[in-house]
Amino acid sequence: MMTQTLLIELLTEELPPKALNNLGNHFAASVAEGLEKAQLVDGAAEFTAYASPRRLAVQVKNVKAVQADQKIVKKGPAVANAMKDGAPTKALEGFARGAGAKIEDLTIVHDGKQDVYAYEYVQIGKPLGGLLEDIINQAVKKLPIPKVMRWGSSTFTFVRPVHGLVVLHGGDIVNVSVLGLQSGNKTLGHRFLSDGEITIENADSYAAQMREQGKVVASFAERKAAIQTVLEGQARRLNATAAADEALLDEVTALVEWPVVLEAGFEEHFLAVPQECLILTMQQNQKYFPLLDQNGKLMNRFLLVSNLQTEDPSHIIQGNERVLRARLSDAEFFYKQDQKATLESRLPKLTNVVYHNKIGSQAERIERLQSIAAHIAKALGADAAAAERAARLAKADLVTEMVGEFPELQGTMGKYYARLDGETEEITEAVEQHYQPRFAGDNLPEGKIAAAVALADKLETLVGIWGIGLIPTGDKDPYALRRAALGILRMLMQYGLDVNELIQTAFNSFPQGLLNEKTPSETADFMQARLAVLLQNDYPQDIVAAVLAKQPRRLDDLTAKLQAVAAFKQLPEAAALAAANKRVQNLLKKADAELGAVNESLLQQDEEKALFAAAQGLQPKIAAAVAEGNFQTALSELASVKPQVDAFFDGVMVMAEDAAVKQNRLNLLNRLAEQMNAVADIALLGE
């Protein structure tokens, strides 16, 4: 059957830039999926998504004009029950009637179990035009659009008004109606660089015609790659690097249909303002690409992406420079104003900054952070006074002009202002870094003072918010407690502190009776669950479960334990020892009395004597290895007792009739279990 390329384009008003790429990909994928389900393509649809500020489009290869005819077999009642005394039963008659057939039209087929009556017929394939309208409408409905709008007198809704619809199969228009628009082959190009309508000659010529006649690079991916290439080239020419993160690059790509990269600049005196402020202003407000020199310092040059191409771009450059100058002047003003007061002098204003109405203001919070940070610093062997001072100043920049304008700069501005106030570098860095890690993969705070304040900040948040009942549920976590927990865990994996003791310290910093009394135990359980999630990114679930079953309170040796258990699992003896350990644990659950020391005089059989001797020899080796942090050696020692363990279970009845003998054997197994599980609960391996 002949196939041709299918093109669908929705011509719209300017689409939301941050959502554009996602909308384009969803629309294209939904159309392709609809064509696959309708069997208008063979196998997986080969498609290309297009998305620009004024259009969403998809091009699908090898689309059929008509569905293939299908042989349909409707199966009915079993032959054995379908006839009675030579006449059809009511079941058979009902099946024939439902199938729109006569009894004599039915055939007999085997359904894999028995012979049944069936009605076989050929379903004639439907034409593309009869199916495509519903496919497009369904694709439009499935788009991830949080808010829709109506336009004109239309009752249809979409993310932005839609003014044109192109639907071509090869060179032929497919007649459909979508969002109140009749399909055609005409569209519009660039709003300013293109004149009049463009007639798309063929579905395959779409991208080329839009580029040549419409001055539109329709492919989002192609525009993005082109912008990135030119940005990098321009930056190299200036011996610089363009600060171009993915989010900004995506947003700029979504704002232009014909990208033109231009170089511009600003006055050098603005460089006296911390570069983070200038970069944020350029990127967030103006969508510009700042340029950094070889030392990572901001230059007074930047790159911008225009949607216009002119012989003389100077007016575009000057216009953008003028707008940026106003923005930078504001930042400069805020910076100068903020320097008129020290961070210390700003602290009383934090009384008016509500943290949460149930647990007080930021000023009250600062008191808690100081005590927690000082406690942690002592535990780390660091300067408690420095940690307390850093915690005291950590939130002071929240009431500065600059942070009021750019909340993203909290911490960063605190560092600069603390430095201007004459604080030590250790304290200034802690003020900035106490928010870290802000997200998965973010850097951890550098140095013990910064770590102490960062841990204090996250512990106080977790314990306080949890303690007033604002517990994360499902995908709702408004106070980012999961993120706080992961940040705490990542830091504790670096520093050897007792997680439960830290939680209790944070809890004790709140007024008595303010928080739920179960908060320490509940947050400890929550941390354990988040720790499992964190570790399962790098280790199999059973290995993580085995290590965490010991409920480690110090996390700095977790990685070594996980690696040791992973190595142990590869040993030929591991599976049998894990099974034996599980058996031991099940037997120990049946103990009637408290487990204690092994009485050698009650050991009767050679197998239990041999196991006792092996356990005796094993104990000091494992204890020494664990004490030295050599967990792999500790676990590998277990392999040496496998023969004795196997022989014991093969030849000894643990639950003997003699109560004293039974208790002694359980004591022996308990001693063995202590050694087998010194590093991890190996019974969980393989589950």
UniProtKB/Swiss-Prot annotation:
Record keywords: Aminoacyl-tRNA synthetase, ATP-binding, Cytoplasm, Ligase, Nucleotide-binding, Protein biosynthesis
A Pfam short name: DALR_1
One term of GO molecular function: glycine-tRNA ligase activity
Reaction catalyzed: tRNA(Gly) + glycine + ATP = glycyl-tRNA(Gly) + AMP + diphosphate
InterPro entries: DALR_anticod-bd (IPR008909), Gly-tRNA-synth_bsu (IPR015944), Gly-tRNA-synth_heterodimer (IPR006194)
PROSITE patterns, per the entry: AA_TRNA_LIGASE_II_GLYAB
Primary enzyme class: ligase
Stated name of the protein: Glycine--tRNA ligase beta subunit
Species this chain originates from: Neisseria meningitidis serogroup B (strain ATCC BAA-335 / MC58)
